[in-house]
Amino acid sequence: MLSLKLFLVTLFLSLQTLFIASQTLLPSNSSSTICKTTPDPKFCKSVFPQTSQGDVREYGRFSLRKSLTQSRKFTRTIDRYLKRNNALLSQSAVGALQDCRYLASLTTDYLITSFETVNITTSSKTLSFSKADEIQTLLSAALTNEQTCLDGINTAASSSWTIRNGVALPLINDTKLFSVSLALFTKGWVPKKKKQVASYSWAHPKNTHSHTKPFRHFRNGALPLKMTEHTRAVYESLSRRKLADDDNDVNTVLVSDIVTVNQNGTGNFTTITEAVNSAPNKTDGTAGYFVIYVTSGVYEENVVIAKNKRYLMMIGDGINRTVVTGNRNVVDGWTTFNSATFAVTSPNFVAVNMTFRNTAGPEKHQAVAMRSSADLSIFYSCSFEAYQDTLYTHSLRQFYRECDIYGTVDFIFGNAAVVFQDCNLYPRQPMQNQFNAITAQGRTDPNQNTGISIHNCTIKPADDLVSSNYTVKTYLGRPWKEYSRTVFMQSYIDEVVEPVGWREWNGDFALSTLYYAEYNNTGSGSSTTDRVVWPGYHVINSTDANNFTVENFLLGDGWMVQSGVPYISGLLS
């Protein structure tokens, strides 16, 4: 109670003092002037007192503080609905509310981190680009969480008047408020030019072209993991694989501990979930990764890795050898968000040599194999297999290298900042009267630093689509949300892709606000001569394409090298 009173007093004082013209390096303006830089100036002005006066950072702090208050209020609203109306609601409606509760918790955490950062940053102090990118990423994810909740409510609880009015309407206003906070942060704190990003102290030396040595022989050779002698002996006896004999820290990945999963009982655990639960909470990574080695086998379980299981690395025996499988889907009452066979939210998660599968089939519609809301997550030498909505790159920053993704409708979707590199994208045979869309990117706000980058990948049909003689139309993507952003660059595009390349979502929705681009692709389906002529479609040059590389889009040189996973930092020369 005392903390609540203190917060309210602070909020009241901020109304009195926040907008007094400050003698800083930033100009003081009215809310009308400041709000012109936001997507919804009218709503933006309603956020602030009418006589307010201040610089963009003062407005930004106030908006973030108010966003945090509203996020906490919304969480309490969801709790009330789940407590009072559970027995009266359908399974899908309860599932949508539970998704909202989970997402609201994440959003509150993101807003706390964002507000604490800007609150200690004076008008004369600048944020490093990596820190500014982190906060812009968190605020982008907060908006994504709101939209995910709203989509779920509109789909699963559309017939419930009380939920529509008690949950959806406040959620819409909160989304507008978060958009204001993101816009003002982008205006006030994000540097105009990107600067060199510092690497972790225990990462490998930076190579501006590629990082390939540590895991290059991961699939079949010795593993470059650095651990204690006891842990090494246990691992090698259980896995029957040797670790690299290399005392040079530059060429090894630091490991704090390791456990094994084996269905025959010879490991530490028989299920992946048990192994995940054994991992330490809230580690900072300085001691290395907690490794879970999953031996070959088919694991029929829905795995959820919570946000507190940081720096977790999961290693399998290879694609189609270590398989995690499930069959949740929307037809059977699950939400799209919660249909995932494998779902991860923990930062700095790494998966290697694994297959993630949803076996629901095309007739069950949305059925997710993998959902990642994990910041700074990496998937290397993995496969993702389903039909509609296979891979849900939900939010935050993600990287996929040498992975195979199979699906039909919107089979790579979400609103993360994500780069796919050296991956194989396999459109497969959908249901009758359906078409294939490889991507459905979900950016809802022009200030979100999100999008899908397909770099040096191969797009070709799966075997079942080949046997159908290409009777199904396949597209590079379609705009799920208003500011959808997807780039294909330096990739091989097979003739399976329609000459127009892209498909509408619904009429002219988003055709002027989306950003779809292609750069220097090859293959019989790569010609841009007959591509769509939408205002938002572009054939770009190398300067523009550089914005969507690992180095610039993910700032990957600052965090990816510690994982040992190979990657190309920039464009191919």
From Swiss-Prot:
The keyword S-adenosyl-L-methionine does not apply. It catalyses: [(1->4)-alpha-D-galacturonosyl methyl ester](n) + n H2O = [(1->4)-alpha-D-galacturonosyl](n) + n methanol + n H(+). Residues 1-22 form the signal peptide. It holds the Pfam family PMEI. It is an enzyme of class 3 (hydrolase). Substrate binds at residues 336, 366, 478, 480. Keywords: Aspartyl esterase, Cell wall, Cell wall biogenesis/degradation, Disulfide bond, Glycoprotein, Hydrolase, Secreted, Signal. Pathway: Glycan metabolism; pectin degradation; 2-dehydro-3-deoxy-D-gluconate from pectin: step 1/5. CDD domains: PMEI-like_3 (cd15798). GO terms for molecular function: enzyme inhibitor activity; pectinesterase activity. The record marks 388 as: Transition state stabilizer. Residues 25-184 are annotated as: Pectinesterase inhibitor 41. InterPro entries: Invertase/methylesterase_inhib, Pectin_lyas_fold, Pectin_lyase_fold/virulence, Pectinesterase_Asp_AS, Pectinesterase_cat, Pectinesterase_inhib_dom. Coiled coil: none annotated. Residues 259-557 are annotated as: Pectinesterase 41. It is found in: Secreted, Cell wall. Its main location: secreted. Acts in the modification of cell walls via demethylesterification of cell wall pectin. The PMEI region may act as an autoinhibitory domain and prevent untimely PME activity during transport. This is Probable pectinesterase/pectinesterase inhibitor 41. It comes from Arabidopsis thaliana. The lineage of its organism: Eukaryota, Viridiplantae, Streptophyta, Embryophyta, Tracheophyta.
